[in-house]
Amino acid sequence: MYGNIEKIHFVGIGGIGMSGIAEVLLNLGYQVSGSDLRESDTTERLRSLGGEICIGHAAENLTNVDVVVTSTAVQSDNPEVIEAKHRMVPVIPRAEMLAELMRMKYGIAIAGTHGKTTTTSMVATVLTHAGIDPTIVIGGKLNTLGSNAKLGQGKFLVAEADESDGSFLTLSPTIAVVTNIDADHLDYYTGGLEQIKDTFVSFINKVPFYGLAVLCQEDRNINEIIPRIKKRFMTYGLSSQADLRATHVKLDGFQTTFTAHYKGYRLGEISFNMPGAHNVLNALACTAVALELDVPFDKIQEGFAQFGGVGRRFTVKGEKNGIMVVDDYGHHPAEIRATLGAARNGWPERRLVVAFQPHRYSRTKELFNEFVTCFYDADVLVLTDIYAASEQPIPGVSAERLAEETRRHGQRDVTYIADRNDLPDYLAGIVKEGDIVITLGAGNIWQAGEALVKRL
């Protein structure tokens, strides 16, 4: 970065999006400090890398800092934000700092309402295996890396582009991937789905004339915006109309296999260890990026064979007494359908016991009708109270009402357990040999899964 920027402070440094950028900056030699509300594996890792980490937000945490970085979860009344403005220290959003990192490299930005983290992780794995050695910033922990970030020596930076507040428009990627477009974050996108589509068009058209947009042809909303795309693009999907196509899809437990074809030519078979038809599309997006960078197909195949998954994406927490406990980040109705569909297709004979923690009052309200019909692949459904994520309750919006409505819409076995801490004992009392238990949600529901494993 130009000038005398030496020390960078992150408010909410323990967040998955913030910590990755902080780690890359530490590895680049910058002084990094930050604060978070609680200790975690992430804060411990950053501290071990040389970061100055404070627990709790306070004005005195800002010691000789040159810039303050905030996430979307940080409010304007945060004491560190107030102090920074008082000292006339620049306060910038996380995406602006990511854009600065991307400016130093050729950026590969993976965007979309769903599938960003998995696709970014696949791209990072395949390109690393191919010797491209990209810098990596992911919204989840890549299992083979043990982290969500890495400073590479190559020319490319692979990053997840978060559309939740429109700030991904600060990025200027050379390659832009859009996995899908769906209604979400409607507290920000008050214009609804049409505003979301407009924003994605703007994002895609930021690609330079020599770059590429990689677009999923299976997504109706992407198909609707294709006539507005002004840059070179490649489509992928299951249709014969897609530039990059998958056929002969096989889903067997955790193993997913398909045959890839590019513009009518058979490339060969790709196989990886992550279940679900939706991950075939994520793998195609990754393959498209690799082909654009002239990675030989055999290297692409080898990279997928090494893919070890990503944290909180159909992650097995343990298996005891014939009961498998899985955790997944899915918190949008489309993601829930995809995850439960993956479990149903991969293990068709096993009973699925699903514990779901809704994430945010605003999302639960805006997508309520979709939520009540997205759990049909679950044999047993348990709902617990909404994870607020700093939001205030909305009258009439509750997990208890969601449980009532899912039951009214045909879900046969639905139970509401108000306190998440009561879930492990409840689940331990109802599960039996052969069950698959899936904890779902973007909050702290994963803790219930870990506690359940200890009780089995």
Swiss-Prot record:
GO terms for cellular component: cytoplasm. InterPro entries: Mur-like_cat_sf, Mur_ligase_C, Mur_ligase_C_dom_sf, Mur_ligase_cen, Mur_ligase_N, MurCDEF_pg_biosynth, UDP-N-AcMur_Ala_ligase_MurC. GO terms for biological process: cell division; cell wall organization; peptidoglycan biosynthetic process; regulation of cell shape. It comes from the Bacteria. Coiled coil: none annotated. SUPFAM superfamilies: MurCD N-terminal domain, MurD-like peptide ligases, catalytic domain, MurD-like peptide ligases, peptide-binding domain. It catalyses: UDP-N-acetyl-alpha-D-muramate + L-alanine + ATP = UDP-N-acetyl-alpha-D-muramoyl-L-alanine + ADP + phosphate + H(+). ATP binds at residues 112-118. Pathway: Cell wall biogenesis; peptidoglycan biosynthesis. It is found in: Cytoplasm. The keyword ATP-binding applies. Its EC number is 6.3.2.8. One of its GO terms (molecular function) is UDP-N-acetylmuramate-L-alanine ligase activity. Pfam families: Mur_ligase (PF01225), Mur_ligase_C (PF02875), Mur_ligase_M (PF08245). The keyword Cell division applies. Keywords: ATP-binding, Cell cycle, Cell division, Cell shape, Cell wall biogenesis/degradation, Cytoplasm, Ligase, Nucleotide-binding, Peptidoglycan synthesis. Cell wall formation. Belongs to the MurCDEF family. This is UDP-N-acetylmuramate--L-alanine ligase. It comes from Trichlorobacter lovleyi (strain ATCC BAA-1151 / DSM 17278 / SZ) (Geobacter lovleyi). The gene is murC.
